[in-house]
């Protein structure tokens, strides 16, 4: 058998490099997609953090409100004097 020519060897090397470049390009494309997903996730987490902060602010405002005033005591009813000859109701 004859030895492969130098051009054949170069062609084989170029094909091997091309195959490796294609594999690397596939990985880079996947990394780009993953980074877009991470950016979207980062945005969502930022929005969630803002909402949680808003809720915490609302809850802390309620805690800072003054206590409502105590209800006014009911006035005491005056004593009804006993009047001779008058019957009182038993409902009292």
Swiss-Prot record:
One of its GO terms (cellular component) is viral occlusion body. Residues 60-92 are annotated as: Disordered. It comes from the Viruses. InterPro entries: NPV_P10. Transmembrane segments: none annotated. Pfam families: NPV_P10 (PF05531). Keywords: Late protein, Viral occlusion body. Belongs to the baculoviridae p10 family. Seems to be involved in the morphogenesis of the polyhedra. Forms extensive fibrillar structures in both nucleus and cytoplasm. It is involved in the liberation of polyhedra from infected-insect cell. This is Protein p10. It comes from Orgyia pseudotsugata multicapsid polyhedrosis virus (OpMNPV).
């Amino acid at each position: 058998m004859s030895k492969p020519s130098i051009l054949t060897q170069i062609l084989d090397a170029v094909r091997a490099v091309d195959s490796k470049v294609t594999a690397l390009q596939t990985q880079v494309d996947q990394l780009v997609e993953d980074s877009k997903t991470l950016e979207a996730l980062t945005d969502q987490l930022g929005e969630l953090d803002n909402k949680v902060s808003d809720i915490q602010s609302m809850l802390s405002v309620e805690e800072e409100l003054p206590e409502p005033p105590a209800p006014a005591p009911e006035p005491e009813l005056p004593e009804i004097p006993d009047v001779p000859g008058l019957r009182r109701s038993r409902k009292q």
